[in-house]
Amino acid sequence: MHEPLPSLRLLNNGSTTFGLATGGTMEPLYAKICKTDIDFSNCISFNLDEYVGLEANHEQSYAYYMHQHLFHEKPFQASYLPNGLATNPLEEAARYEALLQQHSLDFQLLGIGQNGHIGFNEPGTSFESLTHLVTLEESTRQANARFFSSINEVPTQAFTMGIQSIMRAKCILLIAVGETKREVLERVLASDYTEEIPASALTKHPNVIILTDLQVEENKS
């Protein structure tokens, strides 16, 4: 698997806007970044998603995750996440999308779920979707239950950038690690372009980098 840090260094040559992701896949990357001299003090970040119902200092909120894994060592000029405690979630989703549209994402980090979700865009999400409120699939809640005391504590809803929101980024870095991601990555690379595999939207983006530890072949047909 190629090292993503050179890509970040090339981008990090001035005011840059990053879309950031969370989860176990990103932890080694953020740990490496924290040991470098990369400076984000002139940069802006937008997080891909956030749970509904968790305050920012909750240990499983993505605001807390970002502080623990990156922001405490590498602060940005400004860092934006959806407000998990917003009194009107639909208005909060619209507010966050409007904020995104005021900026242009230079670089978007993504992981991929076993069902092909990117962010919390579950199978069946429209490729035209903007930032929205989503009810999480049971498979996604099960996958994230390891971070909570029990699955009953895993939120049932989340905010997520929509697929169209993600696709506006100038460059996308998708990281897929481990055998559990093989099947879905092979389907994406086989150009199985369908809303039932949200990540397949990336095949239509002009500048996507895929980093993986898997030996997979791209279907050239």
From Swiss-Prot:
Record-annotated active site: 49 (proton acceptor), 115 (for ring-opening step), 117 (proton acceptor), 122 (for ring-opening step)
EC number, as in UniProt: 3.5.99.6
Biological process, per Gene Ontology: carbohydrate metabolic process; glucosamine catabolic process; N-acetylglucosamine catabolic process; N-acetylneuraminate catabolic process
Listed GO MF terms: glucosamine-6-phosphate deaminase activity; identical protein binding
Signals that turn on the gene: By N-acetylglucosamine.
Iron is among the record's keywords: no
Keywords: Carbohydrate metabolism, Hydrolase
InterPro entries in the record: Glc/Gal-6P_isomerase, Glucosamine6P_isomerase, Glucosamine6P_isomerase_CS, NagB/RpiA_transferase-like
Catalysis: reaction(s): alpha-D-glucosamine 6-phosphate + H2O = beta-D-fructose 6-phosphate + NH4(+)
Bilayer-spanning residue ranges: none
Classification via Pfam families: Glucosamine_iso (PF01182)
Function: Catalyzes the reversible isomerization-deamination of glucosamine 6-phosphate (GlcN6P) to form fructose 6-phosphate (Fru6P) and ammonium ion.
Family (UniProt): Belongs to the glucosamine/galactosamine-6-phosphate isomerase family. NagB subfamily.
Protein name: Glucosamine-6-phosphate deaminase
UniProt source species: Lysinibacillus sphaericus
Name of the coding gene: nagB
